[in-house]
Amino acid sequence: MLQPKRTKFRKQMTGHNRGLAHRGSKVSFGEYALKATSRGRLTARQIESARRALTRHVKRGGKIWIRVFPDKPVTKKPLEVRMGKGKGGVEYWVAQIQPGKVLYEIEGVSEELAREAFALAAAKLPLATSFVKRTVM
């Protein structure tokens, strides 16, 4: 599972997930990409699950890049614990996603295979996504 090796602070405030993705919105590494068209949070488990779906579908052909990293901790208090007594412990890590963010990239496979693989990966994600091609090689 993806998570930071070390952070400056153990816990973060919830914050807001506003705006559009300007950084990380272009296809930089591969030929085809899966781009988010809605906003939300991707957990480390969801990112890994979609990655597995991609790699299993393309088998040995092609190279895959993961363009998102879960760097935000989400805390949760234990069950049946009264309010107060501080913030809960870190439960899992998320990546905050804005519309326009490239999530995965792939190269070395046909467009048809890439579309099929991204469709399988998109089914694992809680976001609306679209298939994009690299414009300038």
UniProtKB/Swiss-Prot annotation:
How it assembles, according to the record, is: Part of the 50S ribosomal subunit.
Source taxonomy? Bacteria, Pseudomonadati, Pseudomonadota, Gammaproteobacteria, Pseudomonadales
Q: Does the keyword Iron-sulfur apply?
A: no
Q: What does this protein do?
A: Binds 23S rRNA and is also seen to make contacts with the A and possibly P site tRNAs.
Provide the alphabetized UniProt keywords. Answer: Ribonucleoprotein, Ribosomal protein, RNA-binding, rRNA-binding, tRNA-binding
Q: Which BP terms in the Gene Ontology apply to this protein? A: translation
Disulphide linkage map: none
Q: Which HAMAP family match?
A: Ribosomal_uL16
GO MF annotations in UniProt? rRNA binding; structural constituent of ribosome; tRNA binding
Q: Which superkingdom does the taxonomy of this entry point to? A: Bacteria
Q: What is this protein called?
A: Large ribosomal subunit protein uL16
Please provide an example of a Pfam family that matches this protein in its UniProt record: Ribosomal_L16
Gene Ontology CC entries for this record:
cytosolic large ribosomal subunit
Q: What gene is this protein translated from?
A: rplP
Looking up PANTHER family in the UniProt record yields:
50S/60S RIBOSOMAL PROTEIN L16 (PTHR12220), LARGE RIBOSOMAL SUBUNIT PROTEIN UL16M (PTHR12220:SF13)
**InterPro entries noted in UniProt:** Ribosomal_uL16, Ribosomal_uL16_bact-type, Ribosomal_uL16_CS, Ribosomal_uL16_dom, Ribosomal_uL16_sf
CDD domains, alphabetized: Ribosomal_L16_L10e (cd01433)
The keyword tRNA-binding belongs to this UniProt entry's keyword annotation:
yes
Q: Which family does it belong to?
A: Belongs to the universal ribosomal protein uL16 family.
